[in-house]
Amino acid sequence: VCVAEEPGTDAPDSALEQMARGLSQGLPPGGERPALVDALPEEGLVPNSQRFFHTHQSLNYHYYLARENILNLGTENDAVLARYQAGPSTLMLVDYREESKASEALTSFRDQITGGIEASEPRSGAFVASRQVGPYLIVVLESASGEASETLLNSAATRLQTLQR
């Protein structure tokens, strides 16, 4: 459970933590770790950096990508974001459940972020790469090198192939 305060409020961290614990305890028992989280490559994963979410608003809270919902995220999608030491890099995996929806999201992402290509070095100097594997979208953000982004992209693609329906 993620609980955040609005800018300008002075809620103590202990109160926010207490609220998050209360919400967590109110969730139904038996919840399982989402399979998409298990698809994250283990090598270089920063401990406790995984963030599971569904919507564009949640993505932008954890990692601001764009004002518009360029990935077509919604409650019907599962997504996970994690940081990696190599690079360092940020990796995002999204399950669209249908290849056509993943393809639309990939095209939108590339059109908006990488000029329509798989990998690029945007003006910020950090590398970005993306790929589709069946109904899944893989995005590597803020990688220090093209080689690091490609390695992480390939590792994630290999792990996602084990989840193929």
Residue ranges and their predicted role:
Residues 1-165:
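Soluble, non-membrane globular domain cores that form compact, hydrophobic packing
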